[in-house]
């Protein structure tokens, strides 16, 4: 038992001794390496791009000088072009009064182990000097700064065969000059020898590419808009609006937002108005006396509400609707066919001073009237008008007169048909001597019959033979 105990003690003692020797050797080795680094650079040490790993401090100057000799910076340009800037042409020199010594003075030799796994890169702004005027001239003389400029272009869209397709972006060759100057100076001072102008964003690039997410969103929106189909109905006639016209109204801005040109939409609606509005047109009218006259001017007829229809059409396009509709009107006639007057109307013959009222094609009432005095500048207007409204009992006022009437039916401003109880006779030549201020005076029975059978919007046709 004693022998075994002695053997175990000896084993443990030898083991501990071995461990101590190993630790001591490691410490000694670490210290010896640290001693080496008291005048040498650490592993992975680079200063302004020059590799000084494990180099003696005293050799660093020469190594940096040697690296500077024959220095040139290669510019990798778009479309495979390359150019060079040499140290010689810009007066590149080693700066004798640089702050280089600060790097190795700050180096702690005992901390060398960190350099095994960590890069020790340094940049000194004062390591080199160059002639700024020469560098500026060299930069300004670069071919990439003087080529014909091809501006970058975003993706764009082309309408072809009823649909839009994407036209790829153009990168162009437009240099961002200040950016290029900054990068060249930085690369020279860093000792870099290769400058890729594309990778360092020295070109003015398009904002949106074929691969951009918004590109497809915009194309889908364009195709949605041109899928719109609007059939406008004008009685028996129609107008069809579709993508063949709408595509000319669409614009895509620099942010790839789709704009509908409101002015173009307004022009389209205006053209519809010019073609289909009938207010003030010349109408052929078959009179009660058997003649056919031309009725000119007036306020009766169809009139498109251009502002309202423009707004409605813009909304239809934005929703890509397929729709059949009438335009929005400020006023409508009774019919789109023929002269649009239909078979319910009031007819007033100024020359004969006579009025007829037809309802659903039947003569309801007729009689002599008195119209405006033309000799005093108060002639009743001629043309096609319509009843604005009717009023039971009204007081009519004007310069030098004020009268009460039982039936008031205006058709143009303050002109209207009404009864005139102060008159004892109608028709003939009365209107030329004692005519009205423009209104149509009718006997009580005639005014009453018209009033009881007429509604607003009914045509009132006034003419001279």
Question: Residue ranges of each PLM-predicted region?
Answer:
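Exported/periplasmic cell-wall-interacting domains
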Residues: 380, 398-465
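Surface-exposed, secretory/extracytoplasmic low-complexity segments enriched in Ser/Thr/Asn/Gly/Pro
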Residues: 2-403, 407, 454-456, 461-465
